[in-house]
Amino acid sequence: LLQKKWSDLYGAGPFVFTHHHKTDKFEYRNTSDEADVSYAFGYLGDTMIQFIEQHDETPSIYRDMFARGEEGFHHIGILVSDFEEELDRFLKMGFDLACRLWADGVDAAYIDTRSVNGVFTEIHGDPNHILGEFSRWKRAHEKFKVGDTYKLERNNKLT
């Protein structure tokens, strides 16, 4: 697993896993077809790292860049207080909205900024419950040592 490699190599982690994530509302390039994806979230210093695995061949922002078995840097994520304003700002600059979703009580969108930086830009709302969750993960990272178990359950117990 990449998470284990990053943990051993850089001290990243622990990682919180979300398997086969489903959104409440989803749109990818004007379709509602949602790919089957799993996520692992963790910190390396002050930087959140997100590993994403797509389990199927549904067209997606991930398959836009990587075929099955390929890996690489996919997006930069930005937490925003005014989601609609930030989305509008990117659209007015001429960037395409590749994907928009609503999950876990928060809006997120992926803007196709590859022409500028080679990757997508994710904008993500910053409600208190999300900031609290990210803060818990960051605190777990601050206590984390290379060689520790690299998985963190949602209730913050190391596994």
What is the role of each PLM region?
Residues 25-26, 109-110:
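Short Asp/Glu-rich motifs
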Residues 1-16, 29-96, 112-159:
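Glyoxalase I/VOC metalloenzyme domain signal
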Residues 99-102:
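Short beta-strand
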Residues 19-25:
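Short active-site-proximal "capping" loops at secondary-structure junctions
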Residues 104-107:
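Short acidic/glycine-enriched loop/turn segments that link adjacent beta-strands
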